[in-house]
């Protein structure tokens, strides 16, 4: 429903199910790093669960859950036991629909420290400079250095604005793999996400990266 594409592959006789939800925001990132901060805050509490309650519930059901920002999309994924698929989707639904983003300052400071520590590695510095130069002036060139240079421009308001685009101006795709029938997947997904705004595949406003000869 809502034009959300759902792909399901059944792997019989396997004990766990994996789900990946990819959401491509149709607008260019307002500030380098703002989508990364938003993704980190998805696991820091919702209107229904505090961060501690969320962590405890994921641990109690042995659900591996993560959210991260890629160059082209936001990825939320989990791996759960077969019998806990509906519970894992319910938690995903809560995170997607009801995240509060209350720990913004704390998470921003934490991310800044992690990026600085990451750049202590010579290997990381090489990759950082390589991609920064290769995709200069393009979102693919959003490196740790570029995020650190712009980190003071990342605000709570911009995170909320990005979240609005995440919900209302984005293409949404869900993939599920495990020992589960496609009809059951469809029923659970529809029940959880039928109220989400429609998935829209607007042409990207990001320019195509160009490799220039020296």
Stretches found by the model and what they are:
Residues 9, 14-40, 51-98, 113, ...:
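M16 family metallopeptidases and their MPP-like homologs
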Residues 56, 99-116, 181, 200-212:
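Acidic/histidine-enriched alpha-helical segments
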Residues 45-48, 97-103:
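Short, polar/flexible loop-turn hinges at active-site or ligand-entry regions and domain interfaces
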Residues 136-145, 149-150, 168-214:
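An aromatic/glycine/proline-enriched structural segment found at the starts
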Residues 151-155:
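Short, charged, amphipathic alpha-helices and their helix-cap/turn boundaries
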């Amino acid at each position: 429903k809502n034009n959300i594409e759902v792909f399901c592959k059944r792997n019989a006789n396997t004990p766990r199910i994996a789900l990946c939800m990819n959401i491509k925001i149709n607008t260019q990132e307002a500030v380098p790093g703002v989508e990364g901060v938003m993704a980190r805050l998805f696991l820091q509490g919702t209107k229904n669960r505090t961060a501690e309650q969320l962590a405890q519930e994921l641990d109690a059901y042995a659900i591996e859950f993560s959210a991260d920002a890629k160059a082209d999309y936001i990825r939320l994924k989990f791996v759960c036991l077969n019998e806990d698929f509906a519970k894992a989707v319910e938690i995903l639904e809560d995170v997607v629909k009801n995240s509060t983003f209350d720990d913004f300052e704390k998470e921003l400071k934490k991310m800044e420290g992690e990026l600085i520590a990451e750049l202590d590695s010579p290997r990381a510095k090489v990759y950082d400079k390589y991609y920064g130069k290769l995709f200069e002036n393009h979102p693919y060139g959003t490196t740790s250095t570029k995020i650190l240079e712009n980190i003071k421009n990342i605000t709570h308001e911009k995170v909320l604005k990005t979240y609005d685009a995440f919900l209302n101006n984005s293409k949404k795709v869900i993939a599920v793999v495990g020992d589960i029938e496609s009809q059951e997947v469809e029923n659970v997904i529809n029940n959880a996400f039928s109220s989400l705004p429609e998935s829209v595949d607007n042409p990207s406003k990001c320019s195509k990266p160009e490799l220039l000869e020296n």
